[in-house]
């Protein structure tokens, strides 16, 4: 269409701008505002006189003839009405939309688009007869050449057939004539639409109709909770799901009251005992919602568990039950429940005057992993003080431990006779709340080497007895040469210096891969130079076993210990640590590790960053959190040695309050430039700067924008690094 001439532009500009603005609002989803603009534009068009409209139509080179003095309309009048109709449709005002669309049909009966919109509106109003008439008239006008109208007509016919229900339906004479001619010429009976609809709307019940052999493959992808929810859909689904009981692998009943736990046990009894086969549950987790019901729930679990069910992993959280109560319930419930138990986790109360934790292990002959979390301690009444947490109770508990250890030392023959070997146990996790427990559970068994195949050992929150030097000096670790992971954290009377003495003079392990040693307070500074024996140079290498014990380490965590910077430097320089294998190093919160501000490495607390990073070039993770000497000045030593960090992926420098964003940005920029690949600089995978108050959020946003780090954790108000069960086993 040609553009309007100058004579009509001045008059028509208001309408054109209104149409442009309304269209823009419509596309942006502002349908109500767009409708108002189009309505105002329509009023402007109606306000024009016939002479003005004739000038505008002349400007658009349109016909201006007025046969029978009929009214002329603005060239955009139909367009504006159609836009108003579209706005009403989007606003779901179907009645107004129908009124406008019918007005359009009167003004321009040959516009197929108007028939499509009017039919669609009538369909939404479920006025099937009027919709059918309107659609048929539109198809007559266009000689059945509109796909939209044909689809609408078929849709209307289908819905009219569904709504018949024996009532008289609307018959179109034109359509009936066409159908009669087709039947006469082709002599073929067309299939009834009702049959087609029945076939097309037939629903498929996947769970109910699929072969029973395929259902386990589908059910295995659902959790137990999801399977229980699906079983409530209908009885057919319930029967299908309960037929495949092998799909129930885990039950998480935390927390639960006794009434619901009885229902759970009834569910197991009714469904799992129908056949004579065995079922294996990978995990059952139980904790009581009400403290007073812990004993009843545990008793019911141990005594009423069906014999056809074997549990591989049992997690039991009953803080008020003692080791003595648990053991007695296990004995009363029978041994069938525990004969095939592979993993056991107990959160209970410790009895320092008994050794029932060992009897619990004896009840589970195939146990491979044991996790004991002691949240409280219960002392006998005859000791005069059974309140946990006061000094008197701590002294009583300490006397019990000392008495047991001294008895074990003085009666070796009796120990040999009573010694029980737990030949299947591979992992022990012992976690105590040291505020309430002043003992070392399992110390007798550790001293006597009753776990010959132990590979993973975690000890947290215990108190090493002062009167037993074998425990204080870690001599009991000699009983576990196959240990692969050792985690010692937050224990009283537990010193790194004595631990290193053992590694120095004894070949303890064959293949230790992960070592975590964290002290709970600051002990005298650990310096390997002072610990060296005064001997001839030829004899020194044969007496030191640091390398034999530490050469296979993949992870070393000395966070919060008294180790000095020179000691860690010596471990690397003497190649006691194998830089080709070590992947993770954590020296956070070590106050005796200082970084050099100059090139003079004389103080024993100074860590030679160049020597350490040069020999530990395969490091993938470094933790430098809570280091008082880490600031912008000392950070330069890491920036200089970035070329040695070619494999670094994760860096934690959180809770360093003096470091600023400038040095962090320089380090990351240097790291990216020195680790180029084909696609450009390689960014660091993870950076943790939680609690670094001097780092601006602007710097953090810049680091993210320039893709210097894939993931950044930056929470300014976070004041705790430790997360129980994630990076720490310290219960407190």
Curated annotation (Swiss-Prot):
Cited CDD domains: F-box_ScDIA2-like
Residue windows of the LRR repeats: 425-449, 480-505, 509-532, 550-574, 579-602, 616-637, 645-669
Subunit comment: Component of the SCF(DIA2) complex containing CDC53, SKP1, RBX1 and DIA2. Interacts with SKP1.
Record family assignment: Belongs to the DIA2 family.
One Gene Ontology CC term in the entry: nuclear replication fork
Pfam families in UniProt: F-box
GO biological process: invasive growth in response to glucose limitation; mitotic DNA replication termination; mitotic intra-S DNA damage checkpoint signaling; protein ubiquitination; protein-containing complex disassembly; regulation of DNA replication; SCF-dependent proteasomal ubiquitin-dependent protein catabolic process; silent mating-type cassette heterochromatin formation
Record-annotated F-box domain positions: 204-251
Function summary: F-box protein component of a SCF (SKP1-CUL1-F-box protein) E3 ubiquitin-protein ligase complex which mediates the ubiquitination and subsequent proteasomal degradation of target proteins. Probably recognizes and binds to phosphorylated target proteins. The SCF(DIA2) complex is specifically involved in the pheromone induced degradation of phosphorylated TEC1. The SCF(DIA2) complex binds to DNA replication origins.
Gene this chain is encoded by: DIA2
Subcellular location: Nucleus
Name of the protein in its database record: Protein DIA2
InterPro entries the UniProt entry points to: F-box-like_dom_sf (IPR036047), F-box_dom (IPR001810), Leu-rich_rpt (IPR001611), Leu-rich_rpt_Cys-con_subtyp (IPR006553), LRR_dom_sf (IPR032675), TPR-like_helical_dom_sf (IPR011990)
């Amino acid at each position: 269409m040609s553009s309007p001439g100058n004579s009509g532009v001045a008059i028509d500009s208001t309408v054109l701008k209104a149409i442009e603005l309304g269209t823009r609002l419509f596309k942006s989803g502002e349908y109500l505002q767009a409708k108002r603009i189009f309505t105002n534009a329509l009023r402007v068009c109606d306000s024009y006189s016939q002479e003005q409209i004739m000038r505008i139509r002349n400007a658009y080179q349109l016909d201006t003839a007025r046969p029978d003095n009929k009214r002329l309309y603005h060239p955009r009048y139909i367009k504006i009405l159609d836009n108003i109709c579209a706005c009403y449709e989007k606003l779901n005002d179907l009645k107004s939309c129908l009124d406008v669309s019918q007005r359009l049909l009167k003004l321009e009966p040959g516009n197929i688009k108007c028939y499509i919109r009017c039919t669609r509106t009538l369909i939404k109003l479920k006025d099937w007869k009027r919709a059918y008439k309107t659609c048929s008239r539109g198809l007559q006008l266009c000689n059945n050449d509109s796909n939209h109208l044909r689809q609408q007509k078929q849709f209307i016919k289908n819905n009219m057939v569904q709504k018949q229900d024996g009532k008289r339906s609307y018959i179109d004479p034109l359509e009936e004539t066409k159908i009669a001619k087709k039947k006469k010429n082709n002599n073929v009976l067309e299939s009834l639409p009702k049959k087609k609809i029945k076939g097309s709307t037939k629903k498929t019940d996947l769970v109910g109709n699929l072969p029973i052999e395929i259902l386990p493959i589908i059910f295995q992808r659902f959790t137990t909770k999801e399977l229980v929810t699906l079983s409530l859909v209908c009885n057919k689904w319930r029967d299908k799901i309960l037929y495949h009981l092998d799909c129930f692998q885990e039950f998480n009943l935390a927390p639960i009251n006794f009434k619901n736990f009885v229902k759970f046990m009834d569910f197991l009894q009714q469904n799992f005992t129908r056949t004579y086969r065995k079922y294996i549950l990978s995990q059952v987790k139980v904790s009581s919602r009400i403290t007073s019901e812990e004993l009843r729930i545990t008793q019911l679990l141990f005594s009423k568990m069906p014999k056809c069910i074997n549990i591989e992993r049992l997690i039991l959280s009953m803080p008020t039950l003692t080791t003595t109560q648990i053991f007695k319930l296990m004995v009363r419930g029978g041994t069938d429940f525990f004969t095939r138990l592979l993993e056991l986790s107990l959160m209970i109360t410790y009895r320092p005057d008994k050794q029932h934790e060992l009897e619990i292990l004896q009840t589970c002959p195939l146990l491979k992993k044991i996790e004991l979390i002691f949240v409280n301690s219960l002392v006998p009444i005859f000791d005069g003080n059974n309140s946990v947490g006061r000094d008197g109770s701590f002294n009583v508990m300490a006397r019990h431990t000392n008495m047991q250890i001294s008895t074990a030392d003085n009666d070796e023959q009796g120990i040999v006779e009573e010694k029980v070997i737990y030949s299947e146990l591979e992992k022990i996790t012992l976690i105590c709340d040291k505020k309430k427990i002043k003992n070392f559970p399992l110390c007798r068994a550790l001293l006597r080497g009753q776990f010959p195949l132990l590979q993973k050992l975690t000890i947290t929150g215990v108190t090493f007895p002062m009167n037993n030097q074998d425990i204080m000096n870690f001599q009991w670790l000699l009983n576990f040469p196959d240990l692969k992971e050792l985690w010692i954290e937050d224990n009283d009377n537990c010193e790194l210096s004595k631990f290193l003495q053992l590694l120095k003079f004894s070949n303890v392990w064959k293949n230790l891969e992960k070592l975590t040693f964290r002290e709970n307070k600051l002990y005298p500074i650990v310096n390997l130079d002072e610990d060296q024996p005064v001997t001839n140079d030829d004899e020194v290498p044969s007496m030191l076993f640091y390398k034999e014990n530490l050469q296979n380490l993949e992870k070393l965590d000395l966070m919060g210990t008294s180790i000095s910077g020179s000691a860690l430097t010596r471990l690397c320089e003497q190649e006691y640590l194998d830089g080709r294998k070590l992947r993770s190093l954590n020296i956070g919160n070590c106050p005796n590790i200082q970084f050099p501000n100059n090139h003079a490495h004389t103080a024993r607390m100074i860590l030679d960053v160049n020597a350490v990073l040069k020999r530990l070039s395969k490091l993938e993770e470094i933790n430098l959190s809570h280091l008082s000497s880490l600031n912008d000045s000392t950070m330069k030593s890491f920036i200089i040695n970035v070329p040695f960090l070619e494999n670094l992926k994760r860096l934690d420098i959180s809770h360093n309050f003096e470091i600023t964003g400038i040095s962090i940005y320089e380090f990351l920029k240097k790291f990216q430039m020195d680790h180029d690949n084909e696609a450009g600089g390689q960014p660091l995978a993870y950076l943790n700067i939680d609690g670094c108050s001097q780092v601006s959020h602007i710097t953090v946003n810049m680091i993210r924008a320039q893709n210097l780090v894939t993931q950044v954790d930056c929470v300014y108000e976070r004041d705790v690094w430790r997360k129980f069960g994630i990076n720490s086993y310290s219960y407190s």
